[in-house]
Amino acid sequence: MKPVMALVGRANVGKSTLFNRLTRSRDALVADFAGLTRDRHYGNGKQGRHEYIVIDTGGFEPDVASGIYREMARQTQQAIAEADVVVFVVDVRAGVTAQDHDIAHYLRRAGKPCVLAANKAEGMQQDQGGKWAEFYELGLGTVHPVSAAHGQGIRSLVEMALEPLSPPDDGADAAARDLPDADGVDGVDGVDGADGRIIRLAVAGRPNVGKSTLINTWLGEERLVAFDTPGTTRDAITVPFERNGQRFELVDTAGLRRKGKVFAAVEKFSVVKTLQAIESAHVVLLLLDASQGVTEQDAHIAGYILESGRAVVLAVNKWDATDDYQRQLLERSIETRLAFLKFASLHRISAKKRQGLGPLWTAIVQAHKAATCKMSTPVLTRLLLEAVQFQSPQRQGLFRPKMRYAHQGGMNPPVIVIHGNGLEHVTDTYKRFLEGRFRKEFDLVGTPLRIELKTSHNPYVDEGRGGR
């Protein structure tokens, strides 16, 4: 499970600049949901071996009583509650303010692990007397100098914040992370894989689309047996169950609550919980509301599913409550706003009336099978050469890319690595053409497919030029 890091501090200390720096490795704003998280921005980042979710907050005034600043304070308090570690950002050039002391007092009472980041420290030495000493008066331990604008001290800041939350990293573990797991599932822990083994499933969607209704319908079916598994504080709640001989593990996104001997889901939307559930799932069922079409929030969640490389099934709930005109608008909305998920199957359901639910299970199993598909090098190479013979890549100047062979580079999602010469000139259009050929051959419905191009360089080219 990815740890969550919240950036907290008063206004104009550089939190957003630091947020952009921390998320730059994947260059994606994961969630900026109007209304729900107006003052909290969620991003996904990676520094070294650490992958994390980072939350950017507005300026924090813990004791403000009313108005918009009270709402900003409430949003920041929620971010602190969601976080595993807090990075308290201060402005080293402005020095410690009364507001900094108020925030530090609140953080000490909150009891969360906290790292003090002194921003705008470019060109400053930490032995410059009182300028640094005053920050130790905040009572939060070591002062860590950074420059978000220049990228200085960022890696060590992440190490300091996340190292206590990370498992031991020995050589064997590092090597294992570079290869697909033995069961064919890359990057998801505690799962068994395909062919009747456990499939970890997350039901994602914005509030009030019917996640809890759908989950409760599933958990209440006689053919579906649910049982409790205790988890740790930082793990998402999961409910193992079985349907038609296939074992599943439902990852909580709607808010599962224990009631006697059964689980019940209540509609409680949490951005962090949703992102973490997507990351830990094999397959994500993205639930849409037929009466509202595809919203910005839906598109944000869908984008994160794609970025995470998870298999996905689309389901439009409340289909029975729409007329023909609404359905036409919805179909167009899906085609335009979710065009990047055109590889996913689409199902029209009514969770309340239990309509259309049967095919969902088949689609979920098929999506997982596609995501963990094994593709042999001879077959991939044959398909590649046949595709090139059918349609060669476009010539770029004097050079035409030369594709030689292909092999599988990973699973969940499937990765196909193509080797050759001049492949940096291959266009995105041609990559989509190749993707279509591979998808058709291996029936890759419901899973992203990543194609990596690796150019072989002639070591004698530069030597020959140098001798002229």
UniProtKB/Swiss-Prot annotation:
Keyword Repeat applies: yes
Keyword Nucleotide-binding appears in the UniProt entry: yes
Alphabetized UniProt keyword annotations: GTP-binding, Nucleotide-binding, Repeat, Ribosome biogenesis
Domain EngA-type G: from-to ranges: 3-169, 199-372
Annotated GO biological process: ribosome biogenesis
Xref: Gene3D superfamilies: 3.30.300.20, P-loop containing nucleotide triphosphate hydrolases (3.40.50.300)
Top-rank taxon: Bacteria
Domain KH-like residues, every copy: 373-457
One Pfam short name: MMR_HSR1
Residues that, per the record, bind GTP 2: 205-212, 252-256, 317-320
A molecular-function term among this protein's GO annotations: GTP binding
Positions that bind GTP 1: 9-16, 56-60, 119-122
InterPro entries in UniProt: G_ENGA, GTP-bd, GTPase_Der, KH_dom-like, KH_dom-like_a/b, P-loop_NTPase, Small_GTP-bd
Family: Belongs to the TRAFAC class TrmE-Era-EngA-EngB-Septin-like GTPase superfamily. EngA (Der) GTPase family.
PANTHER family tied to this protein: GTPASE DER
Subunit: Associates with the 50S ribosomal subunit.
Role description: GTPase that plays an essential role in the late steps of ribosome biogenesis.
Protein name per the record: GTPase Der
UniProt organism field: Verminephrobacter eiseniae (strain EF01-2)
